[in-house]
């Protein structure tokens, strides 16, 4: 078979450009352009279920918690708190008994998830001071509520040198109080590098079964099991922080009501 001539060899392309059909699958290891880590983590979030990998279809959590029935109900709490170094607490499982889409039918319901939206900010005088302040958030489940109001931050948590960043539940209260989620946000004051406010946007799946007594009012004192509390405290001793939050809980009524 005759060989190719020299001019044919030169005119023949060395390599052909192939088009890769890669649909951003998380299972392929490739040298891609640097992207934001959060975008890569949520790459399959907004796609239909049939277009997601089998891992997302097999291990999908049920829409309705076990022992509950629909529809999914929503309760919102709008509040503005003065977060101090000693801490504040809010009960986020207060639901009135009734027949509406924001009410509980009976004594028992399950809070499937919670959505915390808002910001922490400083006023005009505090933000001019050169300091850094962090707000610690503790989403706590009170398994055996007692009294007319929740216990204070210092009564529940044990801290070293009264520092909220080292807060842990006291040993004698560990069977009653359970920290389900913990997060923080940072604000910075001063003439340079100032960050006077910090946005909050957190969504947690908790699946907490709350039990009330025979009363209809949405109060902490009417809880008998699993009250959901949000503790907040700032790390700076002299400069408080303001928290403007909108908290939404998504819950289902229990079948045994």
UniProtKB/Swiss-Prot annotation:
**Family statement drawn from the similarity comment of this UniProt entry:** Belongs to the geminiviridae capsid protein family.
Record's subcellular location: Virion
Q: What GO molecular functions are on record for this protein?
A: structural molecule activity
Could you name the Gene Ontology cellular component terms for this entry?
host cell; T=1 icosahedral viral capsid
GO annotation terms (biological process): symbiont entry into host cell; viral penetration into host nucleus
Name the Gene3D superfamilies on file: 2.60.120.20
Q: Which UniProt keywords apply?
A: Capsid protein, T=1 icosahedral capsid protein, Viral penetration into host nucleus, Virion, Virus entry into host cell
Q: Which InterPro entries match?
A: Gem_coat_AR1, GV_A/BR1_coat, Viral_coat
Q: What does this protein do?
A: Encapsidates the viral DNA into characteristic twinned ('geminate') particles. Plays a role in protection of the genome from degradation, virus acquisition and transmission by insect vectors, infectivity, and systemic movement.
Q: What is this protein called?
A: Capsid protein
Principal place of residence: virion
């Amino acid at each position: 078979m005759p060989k190719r001539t020299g001019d044919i060899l030169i005119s023949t392309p060395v390599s052909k450009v192939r088009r890769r059909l890669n649909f951003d699958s998380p299972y392929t290891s490739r040298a891609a352009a640097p992207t934001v880590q959060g975008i890569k983590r949520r790459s399959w979030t907004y796609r239909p279920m049939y277009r997601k990998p089998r891992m997302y279809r097999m291990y999908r959590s049920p829409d309705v918690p076990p022992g509950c029935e629909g529809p999914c109900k929503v309760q919102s709490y709008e509040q503005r708190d003065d977060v101090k170094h000693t801490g504040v607490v809010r009960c986020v499982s207060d639901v009135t008994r009734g027949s509406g889409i924001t009410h509980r039918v009976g004594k028992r319901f399950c809070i499937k998830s919670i959505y915390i939206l808002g910001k922490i900010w400083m006023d005009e005088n505090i933000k001019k001071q050169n300091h850094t302040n962090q707000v610690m958030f503790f989403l706590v489940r009170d398994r055996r509520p007692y009294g007319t109001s929740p216990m204070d931050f210092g009564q529940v948590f044990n801290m070293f040198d009264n520092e909220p960043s080292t807060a842990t539940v006291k040993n004698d209260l560990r069977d009653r109080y359970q920290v389900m989620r913990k997060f923080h946000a940072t604000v910075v004051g001063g003439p340079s590098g100032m960050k006077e406010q910090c946005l909050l946007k957190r969504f947690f799946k908790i699946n907490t079964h709350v039990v009330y007594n025979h009363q209809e009012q949405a109060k902490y004192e009417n809880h008998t099991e699993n009250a959901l509390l949000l503790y907040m405290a700032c790390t700076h001793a002299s400069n408080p922080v303001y928290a403007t939050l909108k908290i939404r809980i998504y819950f289902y009524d229990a079948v045994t009501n």
